Amino acid sequence: MTLEIPRRQYVSNYGPTVGDRVRLADTELIIEVEEDFTTYGEEIKFGGGKTIRDGMGQSPTATRANGALDLVITNALILDWWGIVKADVGIRDGYIVGIGKAGNPNIQAGVTPGMVVGPSTEVIAGENLILTAGGIDAHVHFICPQLCEFAIASGVTTLLGGGTGPATGSNATTCTPGAWNLGKMLQAAEGFPVNLGFFGKGNAAFPAALREQVEAGACGLKIHEDWGSTPAVIDSCLQVADEYDIQTLIHTDTLNESAFVEDTIAAINGRTIHTFHTEGAGGGHAPDIIRIASEPNVLPSSTNPTRPFTRNTIEEHLDMLMVCHHLSKNVPEDIAFAESRIRPQTIAAEDILHDMGVFSIISSDSQAMGRVGEVIIRTWQTAHKMKVQRGPLPQDSSRNDNFRAKRYVAKYTICPAIAQGLSHVIGSVEVGKLADLCLWKPAFFGVKPEIVLKGGLIAYAQMGDPNASIPTPQPVYPRPMFGSFGRALTETSLLFVSQAALDLGIPEKLGIQRRAVAVKNCREIGKADLKLNTATPHIEVNPETYEVRADGELLTCEPAEVLPMAQRYFLF
C-alpha cells in the first residue's frame, strides 16, 4: 500500500526531489534536481517519530566493525561539478564511502552497499540543505594566522600559498622562501582546522635552491615578478617542477622589462603552469597577459578583487596595489606601474571568459588585494552577473542554470584540486574523497555555511548563545566546533607536501602530527582536464584600446551597480 502526498509536503519533510527547483541565495541562479538516489517511501530521517530508530531505518545488528557508517547526512541536495542530485551521504574514517540510499537493509529496499545505519552512526539532517565540497583557495598570502578562521567560516577548507606572516616579501608574494621558513610554516600549520600547503620561492635561474625547497616540503614553486619573472627563471623552475611532479605558479612581468607575453609563452614552452590573476589587475604583462588563457598547457585562475566587475572595482584597486607591492605615491614610476595594471576593458572581459569556461579557477589573493573569506561569494556573484547580462548558457534552459552552477562550483573545488595535484583526496563530493563538506541553507548559499565538516567531523558551524537552553538563540554566528580542537584537528586535516619531502621523512623530522599527503599528477595535465572549464579560444588584446576579443568576438560588459549576496546578509 502506498500513500501519495502533495509535493510541497514531501519537500517540507524530505527536501526537494527530481524536478524541484531551488534559488541560490538572493541571486538569479536556479538549480533543478536532476536525480534522486533515495527511495520513495523508504527515506530515512532522524527525530521523534521518524525512521532512524532501532529496528526501523537503523539496523540493530550493524556494528562499526562490520561496516556501519560513522556519519550519515540524510536527504541532502548535492551540488558538484558532476551533477545536482538528492542523496544520502555516508562517511567512515573521515572519508566519503557512499552516495546513495542509506538505512537498514534488513527491512528497507534499495540500501546502497556500504551505507548501513547502525547504533554507531551519527546523523546530520541534510533535508532542505545544499551540500558542496569544501572550497580550495590556491592563492593565499599567509600574512596572518587569523585568515584560516575566516576561510573555514566561509566554506573554504583548503589553503595553498606562501608567506611567513606580515614580512614585506609575504605581503606581496605568495612564497615561503627556503627550507628553514618552510619548516616553521609546516609546524605552524598544526594549529589550524584546514588543509594546508606551502609554495617555495621559484625565482632562481639555477636549480639547486629550488630543489632544496621542494625537498624541504614545498608543494609547489611560485614565480613572482617582485623577485624577477625572467625567461631564465621560468625555464629553471619548470625543469625542477617536472623533476619533482609539483606545480609551478606564476605572476608575470607587468613592466615587460625582461620579457613580453610572447617571450613568457616561449619560455614556458608547452609545459604545464598555473597562471595567477590571469587578467592582469593583480599583476602580469601589461596589457595583454590575458592572452595566455588561450594556451592548452596553461591553467588560468583569477583572484577575487576583480570578481565580478563593478562600479567600484577600478577605484578600489589603485590604493590596494600601492600598499601590497610596496610602492610609493611620491614616485611617478610607481604610480605609472600601478595604473598600467588596472584596465576596465580586460576586467570586463574576465567576467565573460569565466562564463565561457576559459578562465578555470577563482582564488583569493588574501590580504594582498583579495579577501580570504570571499572566494565563494565572489564566484557566485560573477555567475549571477553573467546570468543577468548574458542570459542562459547554451547548455541551460529557461527552467534552470544547472550547467552554469556546475561550471562555477568547479572553479573553487575540483579545478584547483586538479591543478595543484590534490584531486586524489579532495575537491569533490565523490566516494573515496576526504569528507571536507559544506552544508548550506539555500537562502544563505555561498554566503554563510550552516555546517563545515573537516575529515568527517564538524569543525565550524552557525551556533547561537552557548549559555542558551537550545542551540538557536542569538547571537548566531560561525563558531569553531570540536573538529577545530586538540588531536581531532590534526586527525581530520591534511598537510600537502612534495613526494620528495615524504620520502625524506620531513614531516617526521619536524614532529608533524597531521597526515602529510604528497601532491601528484601536476605535470601531465592541461586545461582540458579542468572540469567544465576547458575552453581555449584565440584571445587578442588591442594594445591601444585594451579591447579583448575571443575568436574575433569583442568581450565587453557593463560593471554591476548592485550585487546579490552582499549587504542583505551582513551588518558590517
Curated annotation (Swiss-Prot):
<feature type="binding site">
    <location>
        <position position="141"/>
    </location>
    <ligand>
        <name>Ni(2+) 1</name>
    </ligand>
</feature>
<dbReference type="GO" id="GO:0005737">
    <property type="term" value="C:cytoplasm"/>
</dbReference>
<dbReference type="InterPro" id="IPR032466">
    <property type="entry name" value="Metal_Hydrolase"/>
</dbReference>
<comment type="pathway">
    <text>Nitrogen metabolism; urea degradation; CO(2) and NH(3) from urea (urease route): step 1/1.</text>
</comment>
<feature type="binding site">
    <location>
        <position position="365"/>
    </location>
    <ligand>
        <name>Ni(2+) 1</name>
    </ligand>
</feature>
<dbReference type="GO" id="GO:0043419">
    <property type="term" value="P:urea catabolic process"/>
</dbReference>
<feature type="binding site">
    <location>
        <position position="277"/>
    </location>
    <ligand>
        <name>Ni(2+) 2</name>
    </ligand>
</feature>
<dbReference type="InterPro" id="IPR050112">
    <property type="entry name" value="Urease_alpha_subunit"/>
</dbReference>
<feature type="active site" description="Proton donor">
    <location>
        <position position="325"/>
    </location>
</feature>
<feature type="binding site">
    <location>
        <position position="139"/>
    </location>
    <ligand>
        <name>Ni(2+) 1</name>
    </ligand>
</feature>
<protein>
    <recommendedName>
        <fullName>Urease subunit alpha</fullName>
        <ecNumber>3.5.1.5</ecNumber>
    </recommendedName>
</protein>
<keyword id="KW-0533">Nickel</keyword>
<feature type="binding site" description="via carbamate group">
    <location>
        <position position="222"/>
    </location>
    <ligand>
        <name>Ni(2+) 2</name>
    </ligand>
</feature>
<dbReference type="InterPro" id="IPR011059">
    <property type="entry name" value="Metal-dep_hydrolase_composite"/>
</dbReference>
<dbReference type="Pfam" id="PF01979">
    <property type="entry name" value="Amidohydro_1"/>
</dbReference>
<dbReference type="Pfam" id="PF00449">
    <property type="entry name" value="Urease_alpha"/>
</dbReference>
<comment type="similarity">
    <text>Belongs to the metallo-dependent hydrolases superfamily. Urease alpha subunit family.</text>
</comment>
<keyword id="KW-0378">Hydrolase</keyword>
<keyword id="KW-0479">Metal-binding</keyword>
<feature type="binding site">
    <location>
        <position position="251"/>
    </location>
    <ligand>
        <name>Ni(2+) 2</name>
    </ligand>
</feature>
<dbReference type="InterPro" id="IPR006680">
    <property type="entry name" value="Amidohydro-rel"/>
</dbReference>
<feature type="binding site">
    <location>
        <position position="224"/>
    </location>
    <ligand>
        <name>substrate</name>
    </ligand>
</feature>
<dbReference type="GO" id="GO:0016151">
    <property type="term" value="F:nickel cation binding"/>
</dbReference>
<feature type="domain" description="Urease">
    <location>
        <begin position="134"/>
        <end position="572"/>
    </location>
</feature>
<dbReference type="GO" id="GO:0009039">
    <property type="term" value="F:urease activity"/>
</dbReference>
<dbReference type="InterPro" id="IPR005848">
    <property type="entry name" value="Urease_asu"/>
</dbReference>
<comment type="subunit">
    <text>Heterotrimer of UreA (gamma), UreB (beta) and UreC (alpha) subunits. Three heterotrimers associate to form the active enzyme.</text>
</comment>
<feature type="modified residue" description="N6-carboxylysine">
    <location>
        <position position="222"/>
    </location>
</feature>
<dbReference type="InterPro" id="IPR017950">
    <property type="entry name" value="Urease_AS"/>
</dbReference>
<keyword id="KW-0963">Cytoplasm</keyword>
<feature type="binding site" description="via carbamate group">
    <location>
        <position position="222"/>
    </location>
    <ligand>
        <name>Ni(2+) 1</name>
    </ligand>
</feature>
<dbReference type="InterPro" id="IPR017951">
    <property type="entry name" value="Urease_asu_c"/>
</dbReference>
<dbReference type="InterPro" id="IPR029754">
    <property type="entry name" value="Urease_Ni-bd"/>
</dbReference>
<dbReference type="InterPro" id="IPR011612">
    <property type="entry name" value="Urease_alpha_N_dom"/>
</dbReference>
